[in-house]
Swiss-Prot record:
Keywords: Adaptive immunity, Cell membrane, Disulfide bond, Glycoprotein, Immunity, Immunoglobulin domain, Membrane, Receptor, Signal, T cell receptor. V region of the variable domain of T cell receptor (TR) beta chain that participates in the antigen recognition. Alpha-beta T cell receptors are antigen specific receptors which are essential to the immune response and are present on the cell surface of T lymphocytes. Recognize peptide-major histocompatibility (MH) (pMH) complexes that are displayed by antigen presenting cells (APC), a prerequisite for efficient T cell adaptive immunity against pathogens. Alpha-beta TR is a heterodimer composed of an alpha and beta chain; disulfide-linked. The alpha-beta TR is associated with the transmembrane signaling CD3 coreceptor proteins to form the TR-CD3 (TcR or TCR). The assembly of alpha-beta TR heterodimers with CD3 occurs in the endoplasmic reticulum where a single alpha-beta TR heterodimer associates with one CD3D-CD3E heterodimer, one CD3G-CD3E heterodimer and one CD247 homodimer forming a stable octameric structure. CD3D-CD3E and CD3G-CD3E heterodimers preferentially associate with TR alpha and TR beta chains, respectively. SUPFAM superfamilies: Immunoglobulin. This is T cell receptor beta variable 6-5. The keyword Aminoacyl-tRNA synthetase does not apply. It is found in: Cell membrane. Disulfide bonds join 42-110.
């Protein structure tokens, strides 16, 4: 590949502009004291039926906490203890941490798909 073609490809990506990810997770960062509760919000605007919450602990892969296959339908994943979820609409799937423990220090991810 020539340098000229590579530069054009890089510039094309830069000019593409921002893209809406379709899934919004808030808050981005949160620090809790042991015993505190909190809710992580997850919203998607793509009309996806499937939504899921994952956690990734240091040195480990993603582990499924809870998932949903449609509004009003939720189920437990691999590590559901200490968490509650609800799915009153297709768009929203909040994850509630009931009582923070040091073992729940993790990176949390929400995902959606068809």
């Amino acid at each position: 590949m020539s340098i000229g073609l590579l530069c054009c490809a890089a510039l094309s990506l830069l000019w593409a502009g921002p893209v809406n990810a379709g899934v919004t997770q808030t808050p981005k960062f949160q620090v809790l004291k042991t015993g505190q509760s909190m809710t992580l919000q997850c919203a998607q605007d793509m009309n996806h039926e499937y939504m899921s919450w994952y956690r990734q602990d240091p040195g480990m892969g993603l582990r499924l906490i809870h998932y949903s296959v449609g509004a009003g339908i939720t189920d437990q994943g691999e590590v559901p203890n200490g968490y509650n979820v609800s799915r009153s609409t297709t768009e929203d799937f909040p994850l509630r941490l009931l009582s923070a423990a040091p073992s729940q220090t993790s990176v949390y991810f929400c995902a959606s798909s068809y």
